[in-house]
């Protein structure tokens, strides 16, 4: 029985030939992402901007999100978000912080509850103040930075320094483009978005390490081969695995977008974008960087000798 293959084996695609196009293209996208972040900004959710969240459940039938949105907007409590989640009877109503402090915020909560009426059960009320939201921003940013530094320190000691630099540049490229994606699409940026960014970083580094490990293996084997040709051979060797992995994860994320509800929609869409960007950067950003950093086959550590790798004979 033949195994399922999404890419042909023994391909000879000249990936490194496109490095003169991929680098300017990626630099342009990175600049656009930074400009979007600085000028447009992120659509911070209640976790980071502060405000009130009401989790409701319709007592009879399906929740009418359009009617709930109209009721909340009529009360003039600021920006209102109404999202379904879980079952058809469940809905979340969000609105921002009110001028006047805690007293004004609680008064707005009471007005919304009274306007909704007895048709809905209020299952949860959550108020996030500006101080708490600021602490969440700092904690989330610190968590992302620490995780990236820890993994990149591992790469620095695990591989040659050129490999670590290439991985750092590819990871920062993926982070910038993901931030730009959030700013452009206006997806709500909340704590699940932080989880998405950390997952994208992990996926990107995993794809990068797989490619770098194959490149190092080939450099030990073919020390005299030109670096660009050797990297092409290495990337072509792992491309079937890369396509299979990305496709599998992509199909799972499509299911989350279709059936997961609004609560994890931003996470799922960000992950889809991140998988695409991470796959691209591992091939067209990290690998060509080794050429520009002057990595050659004779600079890579020697492979283990056959005597060292041959298993010892056991006595009968």
Show where each model-derived region lies.
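A structural signal for conserved, well-ordered secondary-structure elements
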Residues: 1-316
């Amino acid at each position: 029985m033949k195994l399922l293959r999404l890419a042909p084996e023994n391909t000879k695609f000249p990936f490194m030939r496109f490095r003169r196009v991929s680098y300017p293209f990626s630099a342009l996208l990175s600049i656009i992402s930074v400009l979007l972040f600085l000028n447009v900004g992120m659509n911070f959710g209640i976790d980071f901007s502060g405000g009130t969240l009401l989790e409701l459940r319709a007592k009879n039938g399906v929740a009418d999100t359009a009617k709930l949105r109209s009721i909340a907007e009529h009360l003039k409590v600021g920006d209102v978000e109404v999202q379904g989640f879980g079952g058809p009877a469940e809905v979340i109503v969000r609105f921002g912080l009110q001028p006047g402090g805690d007293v004004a915020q609680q008064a707005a909560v009471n007005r919304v509850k009274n306007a909704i009426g007895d048709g809905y059960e209020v299952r949860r009320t959550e108020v996030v103040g500006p101080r708490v939201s600021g602490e969440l921003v700092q904690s989330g940013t610190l968590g992302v930075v620490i995780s990236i530094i820890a993994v990149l320190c591992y790469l620095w000691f695990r591989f040659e320094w050129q490999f670590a630099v290439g991985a750092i540049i590819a990871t920062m490229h993926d982070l910038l483009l993901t931030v730009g994606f959030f700013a452009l699409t206006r997806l709500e940026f909340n704590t699940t978005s932080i989880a998405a960014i950390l997952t994208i970083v992990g996926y990107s580094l995993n794809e990068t390490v797989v490619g770098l490990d194959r490149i190092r293996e080939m450099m030990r084997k073919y020390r005299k081969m030109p670096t660009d040709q050797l990297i092409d051979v290495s990337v072509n060797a792992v491309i079937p695995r890369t396509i299979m992995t990305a496709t599998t994860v992509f199909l799972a994320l499509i299911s989350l977008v279709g059936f997961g509800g609004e609560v994890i929609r931003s996470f799922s869409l960000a992950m889809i974008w991140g998988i695409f960007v991470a796959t691209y950067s591992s091939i067209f950003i990290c690998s060509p960087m080794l050429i520009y950093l002057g990595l050659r086959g004779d600079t890579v550590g020697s492979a283990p000798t056959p005597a060292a790798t041959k298993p010892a004979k056991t006595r009968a």
